[in-house]
Amino acid sequence: RNAFGETFPEQKKNVKKAAQAIADLVEQKYQIVITHSNGPQVGMIQTAMTEFARLDNDKNYTVAPMSLCGAMSEGYIGYDLQNAIRTELLDRGIFKPVSTIITQVRVDPFDKAFNHPTKVIGRVMTREEADAEEEKGNHVVPEGDGFRRIIASPKPVDIYEIDAIEALLDAGQIVIAAGGGGIPVMEQGTTLKGASAVIEKDYTAAKLADMVDASHLMILTSKEQMETADGQAIGKISVSDAISLIDENHFDAITTLPKVDASVSFVSSGEGRTAIITKLENAYQGIKERIGTIIK
């Protein structure tokens, strides 16, 4: 589901719920790094910027690239989230700084995902508009009575702002980073060039958790637990059991597979690690391993 909603009032309401769950963990002295989805937000920004350019008869404005749209979504979602967390903590008598970092994530230009795009973005287009997009080298797919653009979802390779994230953690701050999977970039000499892609947030969360050497990775979603293909709830399982379930195609490739696969990657990358997948409201109970899907 979309974690933050499609309108600004809906987002305000949902970030308050997220802030309450996070504050529960802070009260128990957990050190926290937060990443988040940018669900429809990045697509809405891209649609708005594209429409603005299309309606500008004087051609003073151009379409914003996906990397820029991703940066915008990181900024405004992070702004709402950090202020909601700050307020919730102060209401509980806790002073703890919260900072948002606009985060660039390196992707491999040869990642096979660029040849098999999966993420649908933007508004519905006419056949003529879709043809124009394809002439630019973009991919489109049919949707309803029209067409929409589809972009790649490569895996994260490195996080450029990791030193800044760790410095803030060492200073006792709560850090919001790599929102929406981070801004996908490629190295070109000394330049970081934005890629026309959206990184799957679950994989970036696992990469970030690994790089800061976290003990736990929590993926908070709309489900209390993951389920097998025949609807059986998945509780505490080993990495090998999780891999077997992946190999047996128990998870949807777009929605649940990345969560389980990213959890396996994180737990397998270090000693004594645990991944938890559960509902946002269950964050505290989840980290105590009382509820949710626990992989360790």
Stretches found by the model and what they are:
Residues R1-K296:
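C-terminal catalytic "cap/lid" subdomain
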